């Protein structure tokens, strides 16, 4: 059984086809339909999968609750999917909520006291828990107890309530914002990495099969190459390319058709869209390749600092188009080449690394 409280996401760019956050409730429902149910069906993240397989097997063998799990990494990489898989593999219920929803200690206490033995509580955006709610969570994680206040004023007293053993699965895109006391209470900590094109091609092929969409291996790989290492983006691009194939062709997704559809969507050969190119072009042209501070860059392109740091930058840095240095952001030689420009300094990438 899965019960879901209303989730409140961070600021989004919902009109971006390559956004790593769900654009609508309809898209979230689409994602659920494609979500793998078991660990064996989950593609990629081999190290994390291997660890979870061992830990879950051991917990089942001892008939214990799985240790608390912290999943962190960029959005769209499968943190929510893994939480659902953990609950299914352990044969228990899952309760799902998010940090911003838990405004008062009573909100969390109500969830915890309704958990059955070994159930999974999934808290997305756990870094956004309020301090007062987080304090309630500490004894729950360590001792399976919570302290609640009965009464008010001088007559108020603290009462301990015992909880059933449970597993907390926390997910965050900003692990650095977690407090040390909270982070230290997770026995299993796993970072999710961007996917390779081959892994994403396997995900696209599986999703196409579930959607009854005909696709050849080259078509799946072309979509994967432009999906920014993110399964959520790969599945969204697949939906749009499928529409294009049904209208402009016989419905079969080939490499040529995928290329034409993605060019129409303004997604270039490395997965950049208009916003990505706008950011890189600002660094290249307005700030002479950098270094430039993130606040100046945010003002130049009209986006929030958090959007740049959480949404736009990670993929560019991981792919080697942008560098963070003590003096600010710098475009690499790869960024100049992508726009057909000559780097104004010899060894520019090496120079940036030394700053």
Curated annotation (Swiss-Prot):
It catalyses: ATP + H2O = ADP + phosphate + H(+). SUPFAM superfamilies: P-loop containing nucleoside triphosphate hydrolases, Winged helix' DNA-binding domain. GO terms for molecular function: ATP binding; ATP hydrolysis activity; four-way junction DNA binding; four-way junction helicase activity. One of its GO terms (cellular component) is Holliday junction resolvase complex. It is an enzyme of class 3 (hydrolase). It holds the Pfam family RuvB_C. InterPro entries: AAA+_ATPase, AAA_lid_4, DNA_helicase_Holl-junc_RuvB, P-loop_NTPase, RuvB-like_N, RuvB_C, WH-like_DNA-bd_sf, WH_DNA-bd_sf. Its EC number is 3.6.4.-. ATP binds at residues 34-35, 76, 79-81, 142-144, 185, 195, 232. One of its GO terms (biological process) is DNA repair. It is found in: Cytoplasm. Residues 196-266 are annotated as: Small ATPAse domain (RuvB-S). It comes from the Bacteria. Residues 269-355 are annotated as: Head domain (RuvB-H). Its main location: cytoplasm. SMART domains: AAA. Residues 4-195 are annotated as: Large ATPase domain (RuvB-L). Mg(2+) binds at residue 80. The RuvA-RuvB-RuvC complex processes Holliday junction (HJ) DNA during genetic recombination and DNA repair, while the RuvA-RuvB complex plays an important role in the rescue of blocked DNA replication forks via replication fork reversal (RFR). RuvA specifically binds to HJ cruciform DNA, conferring on it an open structure. The RuvB hexamer acts as an ATP-dependent pump, pulling dsDNA into and through the RuvAB complex. RuvB forms 2 homohexamers on either side of HJ DNA bound by 1 or 2 RuvA tetramers; 4 subunits per hexamer contact DNA at a time. Has 3 domains, the large (RuvB-L) and small ATPase (RuvB-S) domains and the C-terminal head (RuvB-H) domain. The head domain binds DNA, while the ATPase domains jointly bind ATP, ADP or are empty depending on the state of the subunit in the translocation cycle. During a single DNA translocation step the structure of each domain remains the same, but their relative positions change. Homohexamer. Forms an RuvA(8)-RuvB(12)-Holliday junction (HJ) complex. HJ DNA is sandwiched between 2 RuvA tetramers; dsDNA enters through RuvA and exits via RuvB. An RuvB hexamer assembles on each DNA strand where it exits the tetramer. Each RuvB hexamer is contacted by two RuvA subunits (via domain III) on 2 adjacent RuvB subunits; this complex drives branch migration. In the full resolvosome a probable DNA-RuvA(4)-RuvB(12)-RuvC(2) complex forms which resolves the HJ. NCBIfam families: PRK00080.1, ruvB. Belongs to the RuvB family. This is Holliday junction branch migration complex subunit RuvB. It comes from Cupriavidus metallidurans (strain ATCC 43123 / DSM 2839 / NBRC 102507 / CH34). The gene is ruvB.
